[in-house]
């Protein structure tokens, strides 16, 4: 989240760990690890059990698509736009597919299972998860993603934030949490095309329109420029991927982590 703390890459010897490396080297190592995983999966047979969160992705072909989806995300973080597009097209990305298709962390109530700690009942007092009021004021009229920030029966406060809306993304204690899903891949496809420019801008508009119209909005009618489409992209990522762990990373990537933007 800070992009400054770094990670250790060399951990082969737990008694003699390698140095902490910076963001650029860390992302390069992650990308290389994903590439190695893809190579290992090629022609392999998967013999180990996977949770229900991997439904549809349990064989080598499915895991390769999952691997490429993660590689696309990493490529975006690295600003390697051609690599992002290549990885997206090798993933389970589908412009006309179900937005929820993907791989998930799953939860259950059985012995030894874990509950989703991001679930908080609506209208609860005390320990709450509140949506910033700007989520409701910034969203366009008719956008069905307003349901992710449900209106409370009465406002409350937590950690200095007062709001009349609860975060309502995970609606039960066993609701799955996406690791990566098709809607994010569509947005990655749009972002890479925006950054590549040229004919990519038209492809980006098509992808953004798919997001908009699927959430009850009219097609994009703004300027078809890299700057304007980046603003639109970040808006759609904000509402589509709300409470999935992307917003601050997105703002940091575009140098927008100011007090004005951090609120949401």
Named regions from a protein language model:
Residues 18-23, 56-61, 171-179:
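Solvent-exposed loop and edge beta-strand segments that line ligand/cofactor-binding
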Residues 1-7, 26-41, 59-91, 143, ...:
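Extended, hydrophobic/aromatic-rich amphipathic alpha-helical segments that build helical scaffolds
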Residues 34, 79-186, 217, 226, ...:
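Hydrophobic-face positions in mid-chain alpha helices that act as interaction patches
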Residues 211-215:
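Alpha-helical protein-protein interaction modules
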Residues 1-57, 78, 97-125:
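Aromatic-anchored glycine-rich loop motif in surface-exposed flexible loops
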Residues 53-65, 222-226:
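A glycine-rich, coil/turn loop motif that links secondary-structure elements
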Residues 202-205, 223, 245:
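Non-catalytic, surface-exposed connector residues within folded enzymatic/regulatory domains
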């Amino acid at each position: 989240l800070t992009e400054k703390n770094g990670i250790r890459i060399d951990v082969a010897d737990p008694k003699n760990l390698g140095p902490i490396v910076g963001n650029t080297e860390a992302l390069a190592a992650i990308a290389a690890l994903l590439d190695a995983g893809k190579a290992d999966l090629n022609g392999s047979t998967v013999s180990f059990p996977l949770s229900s969160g991997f439904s549809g992705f349990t064989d080598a072909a499915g895991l390769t698509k999952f691997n490429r989806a993660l590689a696309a995300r990493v490529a975006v973080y690295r600003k390697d736009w051609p690599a992002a597009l290549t990885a997206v097209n090798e993933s389970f990305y589908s412009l006309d597919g179900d937005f929820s298709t993907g791989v998930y962390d799953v939860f259950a109530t059985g012995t030894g299972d874990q509950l989703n700690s991001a679930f908080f009942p609506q209208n609860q007092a005390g320990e709450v998860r509140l949506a910033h009021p700007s989520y409701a004021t910034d969203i366009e009229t008719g956008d069905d993603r307003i349901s992710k920030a449900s209106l409370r029966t009465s406002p409350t406060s937590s950690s200095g934030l007062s709001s009349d809306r609860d975060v309502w993304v995970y609606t039960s204690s066993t609701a799955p949490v996406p690791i990566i899903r098709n809607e994010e891949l569509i947005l990655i496809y749009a972002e890479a095309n925006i950054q590549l420019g040229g004919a990519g801008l038209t492809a980006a508009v098509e992808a953004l329109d798919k997001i908009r119209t699927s959430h009850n909005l009219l097609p994009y009618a703004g300027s078809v420029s890299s700057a304007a489409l980046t603003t639109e992209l970040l808006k759609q990522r904000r509402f589509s991927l709300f409470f999935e762990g992307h917003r601050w990373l997105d703002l940091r990537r575009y140098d927008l982590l100011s007090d004005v933007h951090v609120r949401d």
